[in-house]
Amino acid sequence: MIASCRKLLPVPQGQRGLRQSEAVFTHVHQLPGLIEELSAYLTDCEIVAVCASRRPRDEEASYMPVFQAGDAQGRSLAALLRVPCFATTHQRGHVEAAKVDSGVAAGDLLAVHLSGGTTEVLSLVDDRLTLLGGTLDLHAGQVVDRTGVALGLPFPAGPHLEELAVRGTARALLPVAMADGGLYCHLSGAETQVQRWIAQGMMPKEDIAREVYDLLARTVSRMVTAASQQTGIRQVLIAGGVASSRLFRELVTQRTAKRQPDLRVRFGRPEYSGDNAVGVALIGARKWREQQALKEIEYGSTDTGR
């Protein structure tokens, strides 16, 4: 990697995120500065391609306005540089980034995407992502952020809530709510109970935080073991912002080892688990190399025919 530039979207204290219109405006406002910062590292580099996330997932109907900001910037840069602009999805970017230094073996795998906007278990077979399960209401990251904000922590609350959780004790007070043979889950009931604990003020903040991470680990462990039993796939790659938590990694690994010892659970680097452009860049590089290989074959066959 030559350079990596990031800037969190500013969220006012007490709020649990941004509306789409606010997020689009903030992306449009912040992207030029990030590109200027990035350009300082590229003085001796030749840019051969650009890649951008065009939509959240692989499905054609998948759409969020905020992705138009990055896609527009990418296409504009590519046009000015006269290089190809490749498109991918936010979810594929997460999975690709999580592969870096994860130790995941080549072949089929189960991919788990856990964030504030996604809680899904998918199979990745022959480069095809297929949805197997997920949440039926709240996302894992929403539970973390709503708990943290209610406790007076900044948004995004993950790192701050984890600091509390490592000092707390869990007694599995939040029941796991599963559906469809364990492939799908409900998290809204647990979040309601957490808000009740916070309002009552009778339970230590550290224990509340620990109960949240314990619940998420138990839930994800059940989902991946159910997916493994359905598909026969024995390796799992967990990506997304929630997966950057060291505590969550330890808990879900321990839980899964007890439930299904032959299931290998892998994570990427913590810094590549949350939102980042590393996976998107790797996808763009691969697509460019594939394009170049096709050109060589085409030119080679043309020369042979002469």
Language model feature labels by segment:
Residues 1, 106-107, 112-115, 120-203, ...:
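A short helix-loop
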Residues 1-52, 56-59:
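N-terminal beta-alpha supersecondary unit
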Residues 34-35, 44-46, 55-85:
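Phosphate- and other anionic-substrate recognition elements at nucleic-acid/protein interfaces
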Residues 44-55, 231-242, 266:
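Short glycine-rich phosphate-binding loop at a beta-alpha junction
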Residues 83-110, 283:
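Conserved phosphate-binding catalytic cores of ATP/NTP-utilizing and phosphoryl-transfer enzymes
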Residues 94-97, 268-306:
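Glycine-rich phosphate-binding/hydrolytic loop that grips phosphoryl groups
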Residues 163-236, 242-257, 285-291:
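A contiguous, well-structured pocket-lining segment that forms one wall/lid of small-molecule binding clefts
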Residues 236, 253-280:
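Conserved phosphate-binding/catalytic loops in two-lobed NTP-binding clefts
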